[in-house]
Amino acid sequence: MRLISKVLVKTNCLEVGMRRAPQWYSHYSTTAGNARVNKKGSKVVPVLTGLALASIFAKKWYDDSQIKKADVTSVAVDASISAFPKKMGPPQWPFSTQYELIGKGVRCVSSITFKAYGLGIYVAAEDKHLVSEVLDSKFLSQAFIDTAAPPSPENSHQDNLRAALNDPAKAPILINNLLDSGIRLMSKNTPIKAGSFKLLMDGTKKSVLKNPDSQSQDKDRLEAGFQELHDCFRSVKGLVARDDDFFIELNKDCSMNLSYYARKKDEFVILGTVKEPLIGKLLFAHYLAAVDPPSPEARKEVIDALVSLS
């Protein structure tokens, strides 16, 4: 009991040997992989020890009454999980910028009948202009989008763009150009069934490897990136509750910030950063351009959003 009370006591982050938070988490005191904070930034505790984790199993894992229903600020994805916010960012959420939801759906594993996660794709509000700058560019329009000769008066540029984004050969080219522009994106993965941190890590790695472009990349760089991914999960063990959130922020350089939100405890865990840009680029290209994406529904909505922004 003395150990548990010591772990849960409120304390200043500098007193437990943690470095100052990065500038873009100005009012959150935490260290990647080593601390948890609530979203208000009012409490800092070390990562749960095995003793503290053991207490979880003595409690009911999740109460359905905690599921937040959709309102004017959110949209429903699945009845088993809370509605997804239309906008996410500081000060309520310790992300690098403000994000807006552009696509959501259910992510299935193994079988179309097995619902694993709710998936949301967000775009940085400040970067929405990049969609039209890239996808309306003269080069991409002439080479991949508005390619009918002679041009069809019945099809607008937006019609042609939608067709190109649904074309298995053209979509990866267009999406990769968009990712190369420095657009910031974020994925929100919310378990519909309780899982584990290992499943989150393995699922992320598998999504990267499902991108056909991964087969032609430098293997050493890929392995280095996967090691960084593994390191982000090194200090978190055990089960992941239904309706918790796993976030992946794609930065301008295609590095990724990984974080986790434990809804029942209102605690936000900064897992770390995957600096190797190949991992981030391959992952989000798989989300947005794959023939067999993790969530076809989410990809369809993202395509609709990209067309409307062009």
From Swiss-Prot:
Keyword Mitochondrion: yes
Primary subcellular site in the record, as a coarse category: mitochondrion
Positions in coiled-coil regions: none
Gene Ontology annotations for the cellular component aspect, listed alphabetically: mitochondrion
UniProt subcellular location: Mitochondrion
InterPro entries hit by this protein: Chalcone_isomerase, Chalcone_isomerase_3-sand, Chalcone_isomerase_sf
Entry keyword annotation includes Glycoprotein: no
The organelle targeting sequence, given as a residue range: 1-20
Keywords: Mitochondrion, Transit peptide
GO MF, any single term: intramolecular lyase activity
Family: Belongs to the AIM18/AIM46 family.
Protein name stated in the entry: Altered inheritance of mitochondria protein 46, mitochondrial
Organism: Saccharomyces cerevisiae (strain YJM789)
